[in-house]
Amino acid sequence: MSKRQDYIVAWMEVRGKRFEILVRPELAFRYKEKGDVDLEDVLWTDTIYRDVRKGLKASPEEVKKAFGTSDPRRVAEKILKEGEIQLTEEQRRRLLEAKRRQIISYIARNAIDPTTGRPIPEARIEAALEEVRFPINLWRDAESQAVEAVRLIARVMPIRLARALLEVKIPPPHSGRAYQALMRMGEVKKADWLPDGSLKAELEIPAGAQVEVTSRIQALARGAAEVKVKKVA
């Protein structure tokens, strides 16, 4: 068996009995949160244990009685989704910090200061989160927590989630490849091809991403694009 830090224990109690599996920390966390990784990559081994520390394996009979199946993959999937993941303090600290950064990044990209209509710097959002003592949940997705955080932060600073509608005009020769590029930046609400070959479009984006998206559009058009904020709501 590998060094202890290479794996962690995920466990679940069923009918008074504890069942454990060995998993890779980062992938197990991601699997539990998003389910977008292969179970094979998450599992260190497909053995089902009663007690990993003692090396005590669960018998197929007691596994089937507890889970209705003795298939280790199906059992492991249930443990990961419904059970607990036993993190070390360092792993928990690192994952909490990563989640905190995701929340801050989401707010910075999607929120504005309603008194100015401008994006809010991440440092200011971070300070506000600390001020309101927002409790970060390791197992919940960043987006839903960010929405809750904005409600709390609004008590100590002007902030709201918003969408911005940009009016964009891109002249030839850059207009030909512009439409697909704009679709990757946001939601194209309207697009028209002008007689001179220019593309005129309305692009909806997260309000906090105005500077970033405008910069990307100008890079696409070699600085020749016209970008105006039509509405922030």
From Swiss-Prot:
Which family is this sequence assigned to?
Belongs to the SDO1/SBDS family.
Which GO terms of type biological process are on file? Answer: cytosolic ribosome assembly
**What is this protein's record name?**
Ribosome maturation protein SDO1 homolog
Tell me the organism.
Aeropyrum pernix (strain ATCC 700893 / DSM 11879 / JCM 9820 / NBRC 100138 / K1)
